Amino acid sequence: MRRRLARDGILVVVLDQAGNPQVHGYGLPLDEDYDAFVAEAEADIGKALGRLKGAQARDREAVMEAARLAARRAAQRWSGKKPQTKVIMAGEA
């Protein structure tokens, strides 16, 4: 895993209690474009969470997986890498 982290980087997605995302990336080759990438990734996560309906929207695991996939897909579009992605929800230890 250590080599994969060094090669592909890592994304950390933090969802507050209202479901607003914050994205932090480490080791991604996006020096000049980092701020634009973060803005697009956060927008993509918001759209993905908005598509969840009914029981899925209330299921913590489904919300975390939708956010993880949206952030990872944005990173792949921008950098060509598939970083390890961790989602942390407010109130989670």
Task: Go through each PLM region and give its residues.
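Acidic/His-rich, metal-assisted hydrolase cores and their charged scaffolds
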Residues: M1-A93
